[in-house]
């Protein structure tokens, strides 16, 4: 499901705001500080109960108010979502007047945020890339979520035993790690394999419009499992026991996985400009979004904040043609609306909002 209308009350800088969202592409533009990012943030909060800007939801409450409220509608299903956050109280989430958890919300109204952290995906720590990978699988597969929780529950218990120096007690949790961890690795490897295919298809489309897009076709993208693939997870755990005991933590396993982006054996983060890294990160996130629709029949909202930052005009032109190939709901922001002559889209499917005129 996806929102067709969203209403905000006392959210960030907005006292009251109602927006009817296109089923395809939506552009919010205006000068810095006008509230563009806050609108995207409100949609993200409405889809997962969290912000992509802060872990403190109380900071989203408008100054002078005691709470914020988000109400969203899905015209296709008739569903109504209500989110309330009052100071010093937990967030309250209802779908069709029934209380739901954050996990249930994320599966009902899935979304992906491409924000300042995602822009420089390759500059971030492996933990960030794992979370980005896991988020999509979490939304799509209850089986994956079950194995994820099972693995990390066993990992926590194993590490607790290692801290006491009891290797025999630690080994008691190896079976849980092996069973759940092997499945996690399978899901992740399959995702990366299929997303790579989609990514390369997108690059081929861009190459038809701009030769500079060839830069993105020669990239090697591989997942590192976090353990010795030739030995397997079971044998890797056995061989690392002495080191685990010495360090008092489990050093190998899917919790150490990473996705590596390279070109000619050099890390992308070391050779790509910031603008090139940003386009790569957007294309990879978009490919993952398409993967979820293709293999799991879910259509996450795709949120992209501040499109043109860090991009020169040539790199921006390199990316823009892909917008008309995005079938899911795409919501993005930019300082100015400079796309009239650059995006050939049906006006009924592409809506523009001048944020300064909305307030």
Outline where the language-model segments fall.
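Conserved NTPase motor "head" modules and their coupling/switch loops across ABC/AAA+ ATPases, GTPases
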Residues: 1-31, 168-301, 310, 314, ...
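Conserved lysine of the Walker
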Residues: 36
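Structural recognition of the conserved hydrophobic beta-strand(s) that form the central parallel beta-sheet
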Residues: 72, 327-335
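An accessory alpha-helical subdomain
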Residues: 79, 120-209, 224
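Nucleotide-state sensing region of NTPase/ATPase domains
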Residues: 47-128, 137-140, 144, 196, ...
């Amino acid at each position: 499901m996806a929102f067709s209308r969203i209403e905000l009350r006392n959210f960030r800088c907005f006292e009251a705001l109602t927006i009817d969202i296109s089923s395809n592409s939506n552009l919010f533009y205006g000068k810095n500080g006008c509230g563009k990012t806050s609108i995207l943030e409100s949609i993200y909060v409405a889809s997962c109960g969290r912000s992509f800007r802060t872990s403190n939801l109380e900071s989203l409450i408008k100054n002078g108010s005691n709470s914020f409220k988000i109400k969203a509608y899905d015209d296709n299903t008739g569903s109504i979502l209500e989110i309330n956050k009052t100071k010093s109280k937990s967030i309250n989430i209802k779908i069709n007047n029934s209380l739901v958890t954050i996990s249930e919300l994320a599966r009902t109204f899935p979304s992906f945020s491409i924000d300042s952290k995602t822009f420089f995906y390759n500059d971030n720590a492996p933990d960030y890339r794992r979370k980005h990978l896991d988020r999509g699988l979490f939304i799509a597969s209850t089986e994956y979520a079950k194995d994820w929780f099972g693995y990390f529950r066993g990992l926590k218990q194993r590490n607790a035993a290692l801290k006491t120096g009891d290797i025999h007690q630690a080994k008691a949790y190896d079976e849980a790690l092996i069973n759940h961890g092997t499945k996690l690795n399978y899901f992740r490897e399959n995702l990366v394999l299929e997303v790579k295919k989609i990514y390369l298809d997108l690059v081929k489309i861009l190459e038809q419009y701009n030769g500079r897009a060839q830069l993105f076709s020669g990239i090697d993208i591989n997942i590192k499992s976090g353990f010795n693939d030739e030995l397997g997870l079971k044998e890797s755990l056995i061989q690392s026991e002495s080191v685990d005991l010495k360090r008092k933590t489990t050093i190998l396993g899917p919790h150490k996985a990473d996705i590596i982006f390279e070109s000619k054996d050099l890390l992308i983060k070391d050779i790509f400009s910031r603008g090139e890294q940003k386009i790569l990160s957007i294309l990879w996130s978009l490919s993952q979004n398409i993967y979820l629709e293709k293999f799991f029949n879910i259509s996450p909202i795709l949120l992209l904040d501040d499109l043109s930052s860090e991009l020169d005009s040539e790199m921006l032109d390199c990316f823009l043609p892909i917008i008309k190939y995005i079938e899911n709901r795409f919501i993005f922001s930019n300082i100015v609306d400079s796309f009239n002559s650059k995006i050939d889209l049906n006006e009924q499917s592409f809506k523009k909002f001048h944020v300064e005129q909305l307030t």
